[in-house]
Protein backbone atom coordinates (compact mmCIF):
# COMPACT_ATOMS: atom_id res chain seq x y z
CA UNK A 1 0.00 0.00 0.00
CA UNK A 2 2.92 2.35 0.82
CA UNK A 3 2.78 5.91 2.14
CA UNK A 4 -0.01 6.95 -0.18
CA UNK A 5 -2.95 6.97 2.22
CA UNK A 6 -0.95 8.91 4.91
CA UNK A 7 -0.28 11.98 2.72
CA UNK A 8 -3.57 13.82 3.27
CA UNK A 9 -3.27 13.53 7.12
CA UNK A 10 0.25 14.91 7.05
CA UNK A 11 -0.85 17.78 4.84
CA UNK A 12 -3.66 18.57 7.29
CA UNK A 13 -1.24 18.68 10.23
CA UNK A 14 1.00 21.16 8.42
CA UNK A 15 -1.73 23.74 7.81
CA UNK A 16 -1.41 27.14 9.34
CA UNK A 17 -1.50 29.42 6.38
CA UNK A 18 -0.27 33.00 6.93
CA UNK A 19 -2.82 35.82 7.04
CA UNK A 20 -3.11 38.51 4.45
CA UNK A 21 -0.52 41.23 4.60
CA UNK A 22 2.26 39.05 6.00
CA UNK A 23 5.54 38.69 4.25
CA UNK A 24 5.79 36.07 1.55
CA UNK A 25 9.11 34.71 2.64
CA UNK A 26 7.49 33.22 5.79
CA UNK A 27 4.82 31.26 3.89
CA UNK A 28 4.78 27.54 4.49
CA UNK A 29 5.32 25.22 1.53
CA UNK A 30 2.21 23.05 1.40
CA UNK A 31 2.44 22.19 -2.29
CA UNK A 32 5.45 19.88 -1.93
CA UNK A 33 4.21 16.26 -2.56
CA UNK A 34 5.63 13.48 -0.45
CA UNK A 35 5.75 10.21 -2.27
CA UNK A 36 6.10 6.84 -0.67
CA UNK A 37 9.24 6.13 -2.55
CA UNK A 38 11.29 8.97 -1.12
CA UNK A 39 10.27 8.77 2.63
CA UNK A 40 9.60 6.24 5.36
CA UNK A 41 7.02 6.63 8.19
CA UNK A 42 9.71 7.72 10.71
CA UNK A 43 11.08 10.32 8.37
CA UNK A 44 7.58 11.60 7.68
CA UNK A 45 6.84 12.02 11.40
CA UNK A 46 10.12 13.89 11.96
CA UNK A 47 9.45 16.14 9.00
CA UNK A 48 5.94 16.95 10.15
CA UNK A 49 7.22 17.79 13.66
CA UNK A 50 9.95 20.07 12.32
CA UNK A 51 7.58 21.89 10.01
CA UNK A 52 5.09 22.52 12.84
CA UNK A 53 7.84 23.89 15.13
CA UNK A 54 9.18 26.13 12.36
CA UNK A 55 5.70 27.47 11.63
CA UNK A 56 5.05 28.26 15.30
CA UNK A 57 8.42 30.02 15.64
CA UNK A 58 7.76 32.08 12.55
CA UNK A 59 4.32 33.02 13.83
CA UNK A 60 5.77 34.17 17.17
CA UNK A 61 8.45 36.26 15.43
CA UNK A 62 5.90 37.83 13.11
CA UNK A 63 3.47 38.52 15.93
CA UNK A 64 6.22 40.10 18.05
CA UNK A 65 7.33 42.33 15.20
CA UNK A 66 3.85 43.82 14.78
CA UNK A 67 2.90 46.69 17.13
CA UNK A 68 0.26 45.98 19.78
CA UNK A 69 0.37 42.18 19.39
CA UNK A 70 0.36 39.89 22.44
CA UNK A 71 1.40 36.28 22.05
CA UNK A 72 0.14 33.33 24.11
CA UNK A 73 3.46 32.79 25.88
CA UNK A 74 4.09 36.54 26.57
CA UNK A 75 4.35 37.53 30.28
CA UNK A 76 1.86 39.78 32.07
CA UNK A 77 2.50 43.56 32.18
CA UNK A 78 3.24 43.48 35.95
CA UNK A 79 5.94 40.86 35.40
CA UNK A 80 7.43 42.93 32.57
CA UNK A 81 7.57 46.04 34.79
CA UNK A 82 9.26 44.08 37.57
CA UNK A 83 11.86 42.74 35.18
CA UNK A 84 12.55 46.20 33.71
CA UNK A 85 12.88 47.81 37.15
CA UNK A 86 15.15 45.08 38.41
CA UNK A 87 17.38 45.43 35.34
CA UNK A 88 17.60 49.21 35.75
CA UNK A 89 18.34 48.96 39.47
CA UNK A 90 21.11 46.46 38.87
CA UNK A 91 22.62 48.71 36.19
CA UNK A 92 22.43 51.75 38.55
CA UNK A 93 20.25 53.83 36.24
CA UNK A 94 17.37 54.20 38.69
CA UNK A 95 17.69 54.76 42.44
CA UNK A 96 15.53 52.87 44.85
CA UNK A 97 12.37 54.64 46.03
CA UNK A 98 13.11 56.74 49.13
CA UNK A 99 10.97 58.50 51.69
CA UNK A 100 9.80 62.11 51.23
CA UNK A 101 12.11 63.44 53.95
CA UNK A 102 15.19 61.97 52.35
CA UNK A 103 14.15 63.35 48.95
CA UNK A 104 13.65 66.87 50.35
CA UNK A 105 16.99 66.78 52.12
CA UNK A 106 18.69 65.71 48.96
CA UNK A 107 17.10 68.52 47.00
CA UNK A 108 18.06 71.17 49.56
CA UNK A 109 21.64 69.90 49.64
CA UNK A 110 21.80 70.01 45.85
CA UNK A 111 20.50 73.59 45.87
CA UNK A 112 23.06 74.61 48.47
CA UNK A 113 25.86 73.06 46.46
CA UNK A 114 24.74 74.93 43.34
CA UNK A 115 24.63 78.22 45.25
CA UNK A 116 28.10 77.63 46.67
CA UNK A 117 29.46 76.81 43.21
CA UNK A 118 27.94 80.02 41.79
CA UNK A 119 29.46 82.06 44.62
CA UNK A 120 26.20 83.39 46.04
CA UNK A 121 26.72 81.60 49.35
CA UNK A 122 30.10 80.83 50.85
CA UNK A 123 30.79 77.66 52.72
CA UNK A 124 33.01 79.12 55.47
CA UNK A 125 31.59 81.89 57.63
CA UNK A 126 33.09 83.62 60.66
CA UNK A 127 30.62 84.30 63.44
CA UNK A 128 31.30 87.23 65.83
CA UNK A 129 29.43 88.70 68.77
CA UNK A 130 27.97 91.61 66.85
CA UNK A 131 26.97 89.52 63.84
CA UNK A 132 28.33 87.57 60.92
CA UNK A 133 30.94 88.50 58.37
CA UNK A 134 31.64 86.80 55.07
CA UNK A 135 34.87 86.71 53.13
CA UNK A 136 34.03 88.02 49.66
CA UNK A 137 36.61 87.41 46.97
CA UNK A 138 36.51 89.44 43.77
CA UNK A 139 38.08 88.34 40.52
CA UNK A 140 39.98 91.25 38.95
CA UNK A 141 40.95 89.55 35.74
CA UNK A 142 39.19 92.00 33.40
CA UNK A 143 40.31 95.43 34.69
CA UNK A 144 42.68 96.46 37.48
CA UNK A 145 41.16 98.28 40.44
CA UNK A 146 41.68 102.05 40.52
CA UNK A 147 43.11 103.90 43.47
CA UNK A 148 40.69 105.84 45.68
CA UNK A 149 40.60 109.64 45.19
CA UNK A 150 42.72 111.96 47.29
CA UNK A 151 39.67 113.31 49.11
CA UNK A 152 39.07 110.01 50.81
CA UNK A 153 42.72 109.87 51.81
CA UNK A 154 42.41 113.28 53.49
CA UNK A 155 39.36 112.15 55.39
CA UNK A 156 41.17 109.07 56.61
CA UNK A 157 44.10 111.21 57.76
CA UNK A 158 41.74 113.50 59.70
CA UNK A 159 40.18 110.58 61.47
CA UNK A 160 43.54 109.42 62.78
CA UNK A 161 44.26 110.66 66.32
CA UNK A 162 47.74 112.09 66.89
CA UNK A 163 49.60 111.97 70.20
CA UNK A 164 50.37 115.36 71.79
CA UNK A 165 54.04 116.31 71.89
CA UNK A 166 55.88 119.04 73.80
CA UNK A 167 56.08 121.13 70.65
CA UNK A 168 52.28 121.09 70.25
CA UNK A 169 51.83 122.10 73.89
CA UNK A 170 54.28 125.02 73.54
CA UNK A 171 52.54 126.25 70.40
CA UNK A 172 49.20 126.22 72.18
CA UNK A 173 50.64 128.12 75.15
CA UNK A 174 52.10 130.80 72.86
CA UNK A 175 48.79 131.21 71.05
CA UNK A 176 47.00 131.61 74.40
CA UNK A 177 49.50 134.31 75.53
CA UNK A 178 49.03 136.25 72.29
CA UNK A 179 45.28 136.18 72.74
CA UNK A 180 45.64 137.41 76.33
CA UNK A 181 47.88 140.31 75.23
CA UNK A 182 45.48 141.40 72.52
CA UNK A 183 42.60 141.38 74.99
CA UNK A 184 44.59 143.48 77.48
CA UNK A 185 45.41 146.06 74.79
CA UNK A 186 41.76 146.33 73.81
CA UNK A 187 40.78 146.88 77.46
CA UNK A 188 43.44 149.61 77.88
CA UNK A 189 42.25 151.43 74.76
CA UNK A 190 38.70 151.42 76.07
CA UNK A 191 39.85 152.82 79.43
CA UNK A 192 41.82 155.64 77.73
CA UNK A 193 38.84 156.63 75.62
CA UNK A 194 36.64 156.70 78.74
CA UNK A 195 39.16 158.99 80.54
CA UNK A 196 39.36 161.49 77.64
CA UNK A 197 35.59 161.98 77.48
CA UNK A 198 35.14 163.44 81.05
CA UNK A 199 37.99 165.99 80.53
CA UNK A 200 36.25 167.33 77.42
CA UNK A 201 32.98 167.51 79.32
CA UNK A 202 34.73 169.43 82.15
CA UNK A 203 36.11 172.08 79.75
CA UNK A 204 32.69 172.50 78.17
CA UNK A 205 31.08 172.92 81.59
CA UNK A 206 33.70 175.57 82.58
CA UNK A 207 32.92 177.59 79.46
CA UNK A 208 29.22 177.35 80.19
CA UNK A 209 29.78 178.52 83.78
CA UNK A 210 31.68 181.61 82.54
CA UNK A 211 28.85 182.51 80.16
CA UNK A 212 26.28 182.11 82.90
CA UNK A 213 28.28 184.43 85.19
CA UNK A 214 28.41 187.09 82.44
CA UNK A 215 24.67 186.79 81.86
CA UNK A 216 24.02 187.16 85.58
CA UNK A 217 26.13 190.30 85.75
CA UNK A 218 24.27 191.78 82.81
CA UNK A 219 20.96 191.07 84.48
CA UNK A 220 22.06 192.79 87.65
CA UNK A 221 23.11 195.89 85.69
CA UNK A 222 19.80 196.01 83.87
CA UNK A 223 17.86 195.75 87.12
CA UNK A 224 19.97 198.47 88.78
CA UNK A 225 19.44 200.76 85.77
CA UNK A 226 15.65 200.33 85.83
CA UNK A 227 13.58 203.47 85.15
CA UNK A 228 11.84 204.69 88.35
CA UNK A 229 10.40 208.31 87.73
CA UNK A 230 9.88 210.49 90.75
CA UNK A 231 7.27 213.15 91.22
CA UNK A 232 9.23 216.35 90.62
CA UNK A 233 6.40 218.50 91.79
CA UNK A 234 5.60 216.74 95.03
CA UNK A 235 8.91 215.00 95.48
CA UNK A 236 7.08 211.68 95.60
CA UNK A 237 7.83 208.83 93.32
CA UNK A 238 5.24 207.98 90.76
CA UNK A 239 3.49 204.69 91.14
CA UNK A 240 2.96 202.36 88.23
CA UNK A 241 0.11 199.97 87.91
CA UNK A 242 1.02 196.42 87.03
CA UNK A 243 -0.72 195.06 84.02
CA UNK A 244 -1.21 191.52 82.81
CA UNK A 245 1.60 191.92 80.32
CA UNK A 246 4.03 192.76 83.13
CA UNK A 247 3.02 189.68 85.10
CA UNK A 248 3.55 187.42 82.13
CA UNK A 249 6.89 189.05 81.34
CA UNK A 250 8.09 188.62 84.90
CA UNK A 251 7.16 184.98 84.86
CA UNK A 252 8.98 184.54 81.57
CA UNK A 253 12.08 186.27 82.91
CA UNK A 254 12.16 184.02 85.93
CA UNK A 255 11.85 180.95 83.79
CA UNK A 256 14.52 182.24 81.41
CA UNK A 257 16.89 182.94 84.27
CA UNK A 258 16.63 179.34 85.30
CA UNK A 259 17.70 178.35 81.76
CA UNK A 260 20.31 181.12 81.45
CA UNK A 261 18.37 183.18 78.87
CA UNK A 262 17.81 186.96 79.19
CA UNK A 263 15.17 189.02 77.37
CA UNK A 264 15.51 192.65 76.33
CA UNK A 265 14.28 195.33 78.75
CA UNK A 266 12.33 197.31 76.16
CA UNK A 267 8.97 196.33 77.61
CA UNK A 268 9.67 198.10 80.92
CA UNK A 269 9.92 201.59 79.39
CA UNK A 270 6.48 201.94 77.88
CA UNK A 271 4.55 205.26 77.98
CA UNK A 272 1.25 203.60 78.71
CA UNK A 273 2.45 202.21 82.00
CA UNK A 274 3.30 205.66 83.48
CA UNK A 275 0.50 207.18 85.56
CA UNK A 276 0.43 210.99 85.96
Curated annotation (Swiss-Prot):
Residues covered by region (Disordered): 1-40, 61-106, 226-250
Domain of life: Eukaryota
Protein keywords: Lipoprotein, Myristate
Protein name, entry field: Stathmin domain-containing protein 1
Protein encoded by which gene: STMND1
Keyword Zinc: no
Lipidated sites in chain (N-myristoyl glycine): 2
Positions with biased composition (Polar residues): 68-78, 87-100
UniProt entry tagged with the keyword Lipoprotein: yes
The SLD domain, residue ranges: 118-244
Organism: Homo sapiens (Human)
GO terms under biological process: regulation of microtubule polymerization or depolymerization
Matches recorded under InterPro entries: Stathmin_fam, Stathmin_sf
Amino acid sequence: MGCGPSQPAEDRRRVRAPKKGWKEEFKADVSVPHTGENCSPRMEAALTKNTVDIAEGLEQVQMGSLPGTISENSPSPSERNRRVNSDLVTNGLINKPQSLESRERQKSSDILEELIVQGIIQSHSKVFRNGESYDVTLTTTEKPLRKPPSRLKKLKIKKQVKDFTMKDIEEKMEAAEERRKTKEEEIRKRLRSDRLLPSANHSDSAELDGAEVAFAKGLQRVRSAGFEPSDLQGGKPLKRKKSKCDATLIDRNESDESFGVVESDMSYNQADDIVY
